[in-house]
Amino acid sequence: NLDSDEVKQYLQLDKLTDAMHYVAGRLLNFKFTPVPEGSVPVFHEDVKVWEVTDKDTGENIGLWYLDPYAREGKRSGAWATSYRSHTTFDGNKNVLSANNSNFIKPAPGEPLLVSWDDATTFFHEFGHALHSLSSNVKYPTLNGGVRDYTEFQSQLLERWLSTDDVINNFLVHNKTGEPIPAELVAKIKNAATFNQGFSTTEYLASAIMDMKFHMADP
């Protein structure tokens, strides 16, 4: 059995953030540099900002905002948004992209530990942010994608969480600094495919219903 509390001890939000930046560097050649506090306007003191640049040329890609904590008046869930999309129509405008979560803010000096599911969602939403940061279009309205592509980049990023590269370099115990045990990693990967037959049936049922609705005689 997989003990979610045991897994949590190796999932620190700061380390996961570093892992996402590492993945973005490997995939897209992006470099994330923390922006000094107070140098960029933010809507809440909890929001952190990174400058995103090309690792080779130093070209500014944009800014990435992270608003990780729950607070009164903030909508629930996790999501990505863009405050400004890329465009060259009226000069080259860089991207202002953001990820938002609702984690409970830890006590000062304490790490924020998250579940495997929440870590997966964290990576998922970062995939949407990378989509925005990767855009290179003349008209800002063209920054999106076709409907069937909407969740592709986010679901693809999820898979990087369970890669050996990320696990071996960023999943360490929050108190001892020891790497996550191989036995626990095996349990996590096995759990990922548990009850997969039911999930597949759900997907097939949705597809069948979609076909029936569209083939019905109006």
Where are these regions (language model features)?
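Cation-handling catalytic/transport regions enriched in His/Asp/Glu
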Residues: 1-218
